Amino acid sequence: MSERNNRKVLVGRVVSDKMDKTITVLVETYKKHPLYGKRVKYSKKYKAHDENNVAKVGDIVKIMETRPLSATKRFRLVEVVEKAVIV
C-alpha cells in the first residue's frame, strides 16, 4: 500500500483540451547544467485523464501518475490549481 504514496505529482499548464476526457499538460522543469552551473529549462508534454472535462486551455493543473489508461495516458487530473484568464 505504500507504493500508492510514491506516485509522481506534477504541476503544469493545459495546452490542449480537444480530446474527449483527455488533456495535454505542458510541464516545465529547471535543471542545473553539470559543468557550467546555468539553470536550463526543460519541458515535456503529458496526456492526462480528465473525467468531467473541467480543465480548459491555459489552466494550471495538478496531475498524478496512475495505471495506464490508454496507449499514451499515464496520468490523471487531480485538481485545477488556477483557472485561465480569458481576455
From Swiss-Prot:
Gene Ontology, cellular component aspect: cytosolic small ribosomal subunit
Molecular function as annotated in GO: rRNA binding; structural constituent of ribosome
UniProtKB keywords: Ribonucleoprotein, Ribosomal protein, RNA-binding, rRNA-binding
Keyword match Ribonucleoprotein: yes
SUPFAM superfamilies: Nucleic acid-binding proteins
Biological process, per Gene Ontology: translation
Top-level taxon of origin: Bacteria
Coiled coil: none
InterPro entries: NA-bd_OB-fold, Ribosomal_uS17, Ribosomal_uS17_bact/chlr, Ribosomal_uS17_CS
The keyword Transcription regulation is annotated on this UniProt entry: no
Function: One of the primary rRNA binding proteins, it binds specifically to the 5'-end of 16S ribosomal RNA.
Protein family membership: Belongs to the universal ribosomal protein uS17 family.
Subunit: Part of the 30S ribosomal subunit.
Protein name in the entry: Small ribosomal subunit protein uS17
